[in-house]
Amino acid sequence: MQLNDLRSAPGARREKHRPGRGIGSGLGKTGGRGHKGLTSRSGGKVAPGFEGGQQPLHRRLPKFGFVSLKAMDRAEVRTSELAKVEGDVVSLQTLKDANLINQHVQRVKVMLSGEVGRAVTLKGIAATKGARAAIEAAGGKFED
């Protein structure tokens, strides 16, 4: 027996449906679409979310929330990520150069998460109380 001699057992695989190929197939003439109506036509399908004229769910439910524009230009940085910045001074530009924040970010806040590996000077960057204490304990300082 060779690989090219292998065959599925008889009855193991069903033949695919071929709509519109004779009445003996069970899907002849109308091809399983029924008679007339929207879904019998080519391209005939209702839009997603359409509920037959009933007010759709997305219009029955109330609006809620909003997108804060402040979130667009603010970012958070962990204390453990400060080690990725080259040099001893950490500023907005050095964080962007290290790919820790996006280019459009204008304000950054340092959060306490992980170890502060070395003494760094933070210029124009805010920090939480815990992060500030950890950075100062490692010999770092803050400048405005």
Curated annotation (Swiss-Prot):
Residues 21-31 have a biased composition (Gly residues). GO terms for cellular component: cytosolic large ribosomal subunit. Disulfide bonds: none annotated. GO terms for molecular function: rRNA binding; structural constituent of ribosome. PANTHER family: 50S RIBOSOMAL PROTEIN L15, LARGE RIBOSOMAL SUBUNIT PROTEIN UL15M. NCBIfam families: rplO_bact (TIGR01071). Binds to the 23S rRNA. Belongs to the universal ribosomal protein uL15 family. This is Large ribosomal subunit protein uL15. The lineage of its organism: Bacteria, Pseudomonadati, Pseudomonadota, Gammaproteobacteria, Pseudomonadales. The gene is rplO.
